[in-house]
From Swiss-Prot:
Gene: folE2
HAMAP family: GTP_cyclohydrol_B (MF_01527_B)
Superkingdom, taxonomy of origin: Bacteria
PANTHER family found in the cross-reference section: GTP CYCLOHYDROLASE MPTA
One Pfam family, short name: GCHY-1
Top class in the EC scheme: hydrolase
UniProt function note: Converts GTP to 7,8-dihydroneopterin triphosphate.
Name this polypeptide is given: GTP cyclohydrolase FolE2
Marked site (May be catalytically important) residue numbers: C147
Keyword Hydrolase recorded: yes
Pathway of action: Cofactor biosynthesis; 7,8-dihydroneopterin triphosphate biosynthesis; 7,8-dihydroneopterin triphosphate from GTP: step 1/1
Single GO MF annotation: GTP cyclohydrolase I activity
Catalytic activity of the protein: GTP + H2O = 7,8-dihydroneopterin 3'-triphosphate + formate + H(+)
Length: 299
């Protein structure tokens, strides 16, 4: 019989360990009907006892993880695998967790030209089985943000330039001349904008039968109004410019928009939202956070 060192009594018996497991396991999985090349962390706690063992049997957990590759990931499947983790270490563990990270590729339509292109959304899916079972889904959504203050300053410059160019003729200018000026000189200053990120982490409603990852992305992109595009023709770029002009926002505005929409999302029991505007004006980022614990307390 081969020796089983893991099952022998360890040093400092009686000392429990809060988590023991494996990280960065490669698994091909299916999330929302899409293939994801994932990195998986999986582990359990190790309880203290008079006969405490050196460690866990990691190969048992590794083999059980293969069940995640046999179909679309659902809350029920995650709970089943976590329960199997505990059964595989009967009496030695009462907590188990799985964390799945990867990029979800979605085909997104252009704003105007009816083309489609692919966009990657980084996500992390965390499932824990302790006294209760919880699933947390975190997704990163890229979008564009245009500074309201910069837009106001740009409009002010345009007004000054208009007055300078036309002087006392302002009250009797032909519409055609004004239109020509706007086309040629109507933007003497431009507001600054930047690629931005919304990191939305939600705790799923316990009744959830599937992972609402696409719904989460759609909710966020509609609320923000300026989702980063894939394929872009000139008409799409113009539509994108209009969208940015109609959705001027500081990071605080973006956080509040997301708060309003996810407070009403049927699949969301609680959330933690972080928005990051990667400033083009500054060498630092502008960041806002908002948390909701399923009550009226928001911080």
């Amino acid at each position: 019989m081969l020796p089983d060192i893991q099952s022998t009594k360890g040093d400092g018996e009686g000392e429990s360990l809060s988590w023991v497991g494996m990280e960065q396991i490669d698994l091909p999985i299916d999330i929302a009907g899409r293939p994801v090349s994932a990195k998986v962390n999986a582990g359990i706690n190790l309880l203290s006892s008079p006969e405490a063992e050196k460690g866990i049997h990691m190969s048992r957990l590794y083999l059980l993880l293969d069940e995640l590759t046999q179909g679309e990931i659902t809350p029920a499947l995650l709970q089943h695998v976590l329960k199997a983790f505990l059964v595989s270490h009967q009496g030695r563990s009462d907590e188990a967790s799985i964390e799945i990270s990867g990029d979800l590729l979605l085909s997104r339509k252009s704003l105007n030209s009816n083309h489609s292109g692919w966009k990657a959304y980084p996500l992390t899916l965390s499932a824990e089985l302790r006294q209760s079972f919880t699933v947390t889904l975190k997704v990163g959504i890229p979008y564009s943000s245009t500074c309201p203050a910069s837009a106001a300053l740009s409009r002010h410059v345009a007004g000054l330039q208009f007055s300078k160019d036309f002087g006392n003729r302002i009250d009797r200018l032909p519409a055609a001349e004004i239109a020509d000026w706007l086309v040629e000189k109507g933007m003497p200053a431009t507001p600054h904008s930047q690629r931005s990120w919304a990191w939305v982490s939600i705790r799923l409603n316990p009744e959830a039968k599937s992972l609402p990852v696409i719904e989460l992305i759609d909710y966020a992109e509609v609320a923000l109004g300026t989702a980063v595009q894939t394929v872009v023709k000139r008409s799409d770029e113009q539509a994108f410019a209009v969208a940015n002009g109609q959705n001027l926002m500081f990071c605080e505005d973006a956080a509040r928009r997301l708060n309003n929409v996810f407070r009403c999302a049927p699949f969301c029991e609680a959330f933690d939202i972080r928005v990051e505007h990667q400033e083009s004006l500054h060498p630092h980022n502008a960041v806002a956070r908002i948390h909701w614990k399923g009550s009226k307390n928001v911080t």
